[in-house]
UniProtKB/Swiss-Prot annotation:
Keywords: Host cytoplasm, Host Golgi apparatus, Host nucleus, Virion, Virion tegument. The keyword Cytoplasm does not apply. It is found in: Virion tegument; Host cytoplasm; Host nucleus; Host Golgi apparatus, Host trans-Golgi network. This is Inner tegument protein. InterPro entries: Herpes_U30, HSV_ITP. It comes from the Viruses. It holds the Pfam family Herpes_U30.
Length: 938
């Protein structure tokens, strides 16, 4: 029998040869664990099964008189053609109900009532599916609407609300059967269809506000077209029109006109291309160089505060600031106020009432309006996972905290809303999502512990759903104590927890043998059943379950050895081993009152069977389940059970391997690639600096050319203006490299912390750390961490050496640029030649000297190529002769470039005697200047 998909025909075949109570008990246990395939159920098969059921003992009478409920409660629709299968089953159940008489005191779970609700649900879903398939998208997005925009949006809103009200009414109409597995599957699929429908009708008009300015509107158009293309095709023309209508004289306030490489600028590179190409569908294929949208605080002049999440580069910029100016701090204070408003008004639930589906969908609108969906939340998550807080500024710290809470909450919200339904199916999925995200967030570092606490509370309250005691009283109305116990245990197994006790007294109908055996004999029987190769050997213990010591002996001699064997298997081995399955059957059959143990064993089996890719969330849940199993056993036996660790260790190592492959490895590959690219650039920059350091440069005063030599060999020539430009360029590159090289140090810190966090989190599992395999894994991770630290440090040491060498040249270049700037025409005009010469001379005199780089002959060719690529070649010029009193042209002396202030430039002694006539009042000067004018006038 296939335990994952029970066929009704196979069940009936087993009953052809044996219809004993024990056989029925085993079969019903398997049905309740694995469920029947709904497509295999017919009225005739149900009728045959019901007629064979014993009237008394166990819960057989309940099944017989509530067959419709039992079938819906323990059958599954599978994964294909679900609604069609449900319709067919409804018809078969109607036929069965007409042909089989039953008696029931349960007001809400009798065959007639359950069938009525099931029929009504099927009919409602048929109508609702037709409405969802209506062309609402086309209706509301026609190019020639007869409505104005506000009316159009209100019509759309009314249609959405009408449909959401219908689905709420639909669920209320099937309140008493919504916890049946088959019904829950139908509801779950319906809600997911509604969610997809809702997302397909999302448009730009839903998030635009009257006070949005030019940049706000373009960013929102880009958001809508990028993530909701099908419903926003009209933006292809609107985007272009919006740009054409903007008076765009000077783009510099918006854009970095000559951008240099920066991660924050790259976030908006595609968007910038779309603006300059006026094409919202443009793709960035690195074919063009164009200005990039600014990412610093100045962009807030054009970007509304509530739209900052649309600008990913700006968020990145804030996260990576370590200090801010007073003006920026004031702006950041307003941003923090906005973030706090988002947390309080959008994310936190206002009251204790269970949130409705329309309210959850409304939160999608609010998150979209500020630029958040699951894709953008992932982009921001990536920023946070590679971010290390390095600021003591309170406002920057507040921004990090609030931003993290919003992003993690929004991301998990979108993960949940995609799967949401008011059923136990979603409730269990939500627990898995939260555990998985908790594991991922906490491994990022201690700074996220408080953040996770807030996020967990927000999400848990948004999607809170459970079975209340009031609902259970309604659900079980008319049931006797035994039936209430059966229904309570069923809900417990589905929801995993019920927050109210079952307080009813139990008088369980029994039919047991009169056999009486000693405790020693019972121990031997349990040992024999455990060691037997027959899967159903445990059934031989059924006659002894009334023995006063049965529970203790059965757990000690059957359950504990079975768990020791199971926990000694690896995760892969346990999937192929049936021992866990046999243990579940045995516990459910022999200890029916201890439903918690059966429930946790069943959960353990479900997770090990259904999980194909283990992650930290799965491990966290399975680890918690195993601890509850062990705690339950310890509580029942008042002993301490110490399980084997192979199963959990293999699961943990698999989970961490997946975590590292999913999160750490891609980050390492991306970071190393970026670091290598950066190092290559810096090496090239260092080669340029080294080549220049190896030269002796002379200024030719005749044509203002700078001639460069390696020793006595001339290797190049460039104009003074080109030399000046190159000096300035290298100085700017040096500044940029100083900031960019910090990324390597940050990468080192982040990488080492990632590995250390892995070790730190593993060692938290005190019950597993003694396992040798786990110890070996920890040693390997620590070795990787040590090796990475050494490698990074070697690279950083090399960078420091290059930096020391490069800065000698850069400092000289700074002085050269300063001297040239001091002596430029503008400064001489403003401050006089004398003062500027004195200033330049002071600088030259205090210039420190350094040893010139000695170059071996075989390196000259190599260095020359770098030098030629660095400096523009001197263009041919007309030789300008100096005007001397002597005949002929004297030899032009080449003077070292840095030695421009030699004797020839020494100031003339008592220069004021020669200049006094124009810098001070003199009668002689006045007479010389005015006399010719007076003569002409006369």
């Amino acid at each position: 029998m296939d335990c994952t998909n029970l066929q009704f025909e196979s069940i009936l075949n087993l009953l052809k040869t044996d219809v004993s109570d024990n056989t029925f008990l085993t079969i019903t246990a398997k049905i309740e664990i694995f469920s029947l395939a709904a497509e295999s159920i017919t009225a005739d098969k149900i009728l045959s099964f019901a007629k064979l059921l014993p009237i008394h003992n166990y819960h057989f009478n309940f099944i017989k008189n509530h067959m419709v409920f039992y079938i819906l409660n323990y059958s599954t629709l599978g994964f294909a053609k679900r609604f069609s299968i449900a319709e067919t089953l409804c018809r078969e159940l109607k036929i069965f109900h007409r042909t089989f008489q039953s008696t029931s005191k349960l007001q809400n779970l009798n065959n007639a009532e359950v069938l009525y609700q099931f029929e009504k649900l099927i009919e409602s879903i048929q109508v609702f599916k037709a409405e969802l398939a209506s062309p609402i998208g086309k209706l509301l997005r026609q190019e020639t609407m007869i409505y104005d925009k506000p009316t159009e949006k209100s019509v759309k809103y009314v249609i959405i609300q009408q449909n959401l009200i219908k689905i709420n009414n639909l669920i209320q109409d099937c309140e008493s059967i919504k916890n049946c597995r088959l019904i829950a599957e139908l509801i779950d699929e319906l809600y997911q269809k509604v969610y997809r429908w809702f997302m397909q009708i999302f448009t730009y008009d839903d998030i635009i506000f009257p006070n949005d300015n030019f940049l706000d509107r373009l960013l929102k158009m880009d958001f809508c077209y990028t993530y909701y293309t099908a419903s926003n095709q009209h933006l292809l023309s609107l985007f272009e029109q919006t740009i054409d209508n903007q008076i765009f004289i000077d783009p510099s306030p918006y854009f970095e006109i000559n951008p240099v490489y920066s991660p924050e600028l790259q976030f908006m590179s595609t968007f910038s291309l779309k603006i300059f190409s006026k094409n919202i569908s443009a793709k960035n294929e690195d074919l063009y160089i164009y200005p990039l949208l600014k990412t610093n605080f100045s962009i807030l002049t054009f970007l509304s505060l509530e739209n900052i999440f649309f600008h990913h580069g700006f968020i990145y910029h804030i996260l990576h600031r370590t200090n801010i100016t007073p003006t920026e701090e004031k702006k950041l204070g307003k941003i923090n106020g906005f973030l706090n408003t988002v947390i309080q008004q959008v994310l936190i639930k206002k009251n204790n009432l269970q949130i409705t589906f329309p309210e959850l969908l409304d939160k999608i609108y609010h998150l979209h309006r500020i630029g958040l969906n699951i894709e953008t939340a992932q982009i921001f998550l990536q920023m946070l996972t590679t971010y290390k807080p390095a600021t003591t500024n309170n406002k920057l710290q507040t921004f990090f905290t609030n931003f993290s809470i919003i992003i993690f909450s929004a991301y998990i919200f979108f993960l949940c809303i995609e799967l949401f339904s008011p059923t136990f199916i979603f409730h269990n999925k939500k627990k898995l999502i939260l555990e998985k995200q908790k594991s991922i967030i906490l491994i990022l570092g201690e700074q996220f512990s408080f953040i996770w606490k807030e996020v967990n509370e927000i999400v848990d309250l948004l999607f809170s759903s459970t079975v209340t005691e009031t609902y259970f009283k309604f659900y079980s109305k008319g049931a006797d104590d035994y039936e209430k116990d059966f229904l309570y245990k069923d809900l417990m197994e589905k929801w995993g927890e019920l927050f109210f006790p079952l307080t009813y007294s139990m008088t369980t109908p029994q039919k047991y043998t009169d056999k009486h055996v000693s405790s020693t004999v019972l121990k031997n029987l349990c040992d024999t059943a455990y060691q037997s190769k027959m899967e159903t050997a445990y059934e031989s213990l059924l006659p002894y379950i009334t023995h006063p010591e049965f529970k203790f002996i059965f757990i000690t001699h059957y359950v504990r050895p079975s768990l020791s064997l199971i926990t000694n298997l690896t995760f892969e081995e346990i999937k192929d081993n049936r021992r866990l399955l046999i243990l579940i059957f045995a516990c459910k059959l022999l200890m029916p009152s201890n439903y918690l143990l059966s429930h946790y064993l069943l959960l353990l089996h479900a997770f090990t069977l259904q999980i194909f890719k283990v992650d930290l969330g799965h491990f966290s849940i399975i680890h918690a389940i195993t601890q509850k199993i062990f705690d339950n056993i310890n509580s029942l036996t008042q002993t301490i059970f110490i399980p084997k660790t192979n199963f959990l260790v293999s699961l943990l190592l698999t989970a961490y391997t997946v975590h590292m492959q999913t999160y750490v490895n891609p980050w390492i590959q991306k970071t190393i690639s970026e670091n290598i690219a950066l190092l290559k650039e810096y090496i090239d920059f260092t080669k340029k600096c080294s080549s220049t350091l190896a030269t002796t440069c002379y200024l030719n005063l005749e044509n203002f050319a700078v001639n460069m030599y390696f020793g006595k060999n001339k290797v190049g020539s460039t104009s003074l203006s080109a030399f000046y430009r190159t000096c300035s360029k290298l100085i700017e590159e040096s500044k940029l490299f100083k900031d960019r090289l910090q990324e390597i140090k940050v990468s080192k810190t982040l990488f080492i912390e990632m590995l250390q966090n892995v070790v730190k989190n593993i060692t938290k599992f005190k019950d597993l750390v003694s396992n040798q395999t786990l110890q070996n894994f920890i040693i390997i991770v620590e070795r990787i961490s040590s090796h990475a630290n050494t490698t990074y440090q070697d690279v950083l040491n090399s960078i420091d050496e290059c930096h020391f060498s490069n800065m000698q040249l850069i400092q000289s270049f700074k002085n050269i640029v300063y001297v040239i700037d001091v002596l430029n025409t503008k400064n001489i005009f403003n401050f006089s030649l004398a003062s500027q010469l004195i200033e330049a001379k002071k600088l030259v005199k205090k210039q420190d000297t350094y040893n010139q780089l000695n170059v071996q002959d075989d390196f000259v060719t190599v260095l020359k190529s770098h030098l030629n690529n660095l400096f523009e070649k001197q263009k041919p010029t007309i030789n300008i002769e100096r005007r001397f009193m002597l005949e002929g042209i004297p030899d032009i002396k080449q003077i070292p470039f840095l030695d421009v202030f030699d004797e020839r430039y020494r100031l003339i002694p008592q220069i004021e005697k020669y200049l006094h006539w124009y810098i001070a009042y003199s009668e002689a000067a006045q007479a010389d200047l005015v006399e010719p004018l007076l003569l002409k006038l006369g």
